């Protein structure tokens, strides 16, 4: 059990979050987590339906899959994010009129997230089950409320170390705070 607990509030539609994973993911794992000094908890701070879709997919397969799923979604953010405008333009009001679960499934398929997550070994049926899971949706909604309303984070990524907010949102900021 690590003595230092880091909580990261993240959004999959946040380019700064993707940059943090790219810049700080490996050193955080190698220098702190692998040595048993730090544990990391990812908490979603969802901003919209696209973000909710990615958040639900990131948690598909349970706790053991969250980090790998999240890393893949951030690594491919430009790939699926680049399809959003054309997908939304093509779907228009039709998408807005769909029930929430159908929206989530349509977004996942239309942006290519379903195909991306297949790289992690998930079938479309498994991914759809994750997207429409009411307990998973509620869990992410609760994390989001805690992030924005209770903690009043300023943006994503945001970090806590043992419950105390870290000033700054970049890897050097977190690294310095961990060394302090």
Predicted regions: what they are:
Residues 13, 32, 36, 61-65, ...:
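Sec/Tat-exported extracytoplasmic proteins
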Residues 11, 104-180:
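C-terminal cap of thioredoxin/glutaredoxin-like
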Residues 6-9, 91-94, 123-124:
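A short alpha-helix capping/helix-coil boundary motif
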Residues 2, 36, 155:
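Residue-level signal for beta-strand positions within conserved beta-sheet cores that form or flank
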Residues 2-18, 40-41:
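Short active-site neighborhood of thiol/selenol oxidoreductases, capturing the structured segment around
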Residues 12-15, 97-99, 128-129:
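A short, structure-level motif marking secondary-structure boundaries and short turns
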Residues 18-105:
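Structural alpha/beta surface segment adjacent to cysteine/selenocysteine redox centers
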Residues 8, 22, 168:
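Conserved strand-loop elements at the edges of beta-sheets that form or border functional pockets
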């Amino acid at each position: 059990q690590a003595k230092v607990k880091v909580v990261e509030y993240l959004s999959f539609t946040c380019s700064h979050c993707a940059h943090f994973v790219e810049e700080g993911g490996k050193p955080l794992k190698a220098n702190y987590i692998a040595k048993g000094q730090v544990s990391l908890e990812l908490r979603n701070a969802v901003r919209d339906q696209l973000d909710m879709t990615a958040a639900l997919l990131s948690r598909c397969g349970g706790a053991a899959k969250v980090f790998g799923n999240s890393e893949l979604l951030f690594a491919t953010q430009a790939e699926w994010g680049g399809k959003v405008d054309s997908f939304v333009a093509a779907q228009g009001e039709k998408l807005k009129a769909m029930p929430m679960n159908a929206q989530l499934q349509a977004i996942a398929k239309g942006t290519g997230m379903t195909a991306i997550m297949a790289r992690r070994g998930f079938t479309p049926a498994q991914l759809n089950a994750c997207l429409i899971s009411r307990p998973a949706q509620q869990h992410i909604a609760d994390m989001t409320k805690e992030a924005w309303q209770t903690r009043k984070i300023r943006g994503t990524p945001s970090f806590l170390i043992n419950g105390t907010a870290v000033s700054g949102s970049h890897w050097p900021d977190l690294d310095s705070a961990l060394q302090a």
